[in-house]
Amino acid sequence: ALSLKVAGYAPLWLLPIGIVLAWVLARTSFIGKGLIDSLVHLPLVLPPVVIGYLLLISMGRQGFIGQWLYQVFGLSFSFSWRGAVLACMVIALPLMVRSIRLSLESVDQKLEQAARTLGASPMRVFFTITLPLTLPGILTGVMLAFARSLGEFGATISFVSNIPGETQTIPLAMFTFLETPGSEMEAARLCAISIAIALGSLFISEWLSRRMQRRLGLTS
């Protein structure tokens, strides 16, 4: 249940950030864009343990951001399920941004320009034309982020530790069972559950994406 909670919240909290970053990278040009693109994709190449450590020194109770959040808002990420969600968000960020960005780049901008010439505001064009046409990529990004969050281990254990009932997701529970003699069957059971959930989420993602593309007339 905790794994589904963490993997469910992570894509939802990440979605607005992912849409904004994808739009910035797909539709704008400015000095430093390459740097932002590299930072967004950095979690793909950095070891998850490094990401967890960076989160610990920045967002932990004594971190330069986490300390301020705790003093001002009473919000703490370290050693809590919220921290596990944050770790999954960082790890899944490039997958979501990449999916949405590719979908945005495939949108025919002539449709947006036609709407603008008819008097539609940029915001209305975005919500009535751009966003609906990008939905297949958004759905794919959400499901990929969900599946990636289910399998997250390194950043989570580095940032929020392995606390049963609070931060112990399926991968962390598997690690605990593997370290405990005689618990191989429990680890195998969790492995089977993880595979089933991951395959199911990827299947649903593909099905929803194809259905949305047919409804939008993007496929023949």
Task: Please state what every model-predicted region is.
Residues 98-112, 116-117, 185-220:
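C-terminal transmembrane helix and the adjacent membrane-cytosol boundary/short C-terminal tail
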Residues 52-89, 159-164:
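Membrane-interfacial helix termini and adjacent extracytoplasmic/periplasmic loops
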Residues 60-61, 138-176:
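Non-cytoplasmic
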Residues 1-11, 24-33, 74, 176-185:
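Periplasmic/extracellular loop-to-transmembrane helix junction in inner-membrane transport proteins
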Residues 97-100, 104, 108, 122-155:
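Transmembrane alpha-helices
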Residues 157-207:
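Interhelical loop and adjacent transmembrane-helix boundary motif
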